[in-house]
Curated annotation (Swiss-Prot):
Keywords assigned by UniProt, alphabetized: Cytoplasm, Membrane, Nucleus, Transmembrane, Transmembrane helix, Tumor suppressor
Role this protein plays: Acts as a tumor suppressor; induces growth arrest at G(1)/S checkpoint and apoptosis via RB1-dependent and p53/TP53- and NF-kappa-B-independent mechanisms. Modulates expression of genes involved in the regulation of proliferation, cell cycle and apoptosis.
InterPro entries: BCALP
UniProt organism field: Xenopus laevis
Biological classification of the source: Eukaryota, Metazoa, Chordata, Craniata, Vertebrata
Record-given protein name: Apoptosis inducing factor BLCAP B
Family (UniProt): Belongs to the BLCAP family.
Membrane topology reported for the UniProt record: Multi-pass membrane protein
Length: 87
């Protein structure tokens, strides 16, 4: 499970507060994961463990999924601050 040390930190990268940056963040993360899987070719067990963890995080809709924003979860308080959104 040596290859998991390069995949698990990806789940800890936070989404940006600005909703306008969510799409570019998800595209970047998707391309990063695709290029990592094609270049490093992790073992099947590591890939399944990572995809299972990613599925559970996105399915639970806690707001940590980088692929999309759940409609049921609310935006953070800082997202309504014009000083943060304007940056």
């Amino acid at each position: 499970m040596y290859c998991l040390q390069w995949l698990l930190p990806v789940l800890l990268i936070p989404k940006p507060l600005n909703p306008a940056l969510w799409f570019s963040h998800s595209v970047f993360m998707g391309f990063y994961l695709l290029s990592f899987l094609l270049e490093r070719k992790p073992c099947t067990i590591c890939a399944l463990v990572f995809l299972g963890a990613l599925f559970l995080i996105c399915y639970s809709c806690w707001g940590n999924c980088f692929l999309y924003h759940c409609s049921a979860s609310e935006l953070p308080e800082a997202a309504y601050d014009p000083a943060v959104v304007g940056t």
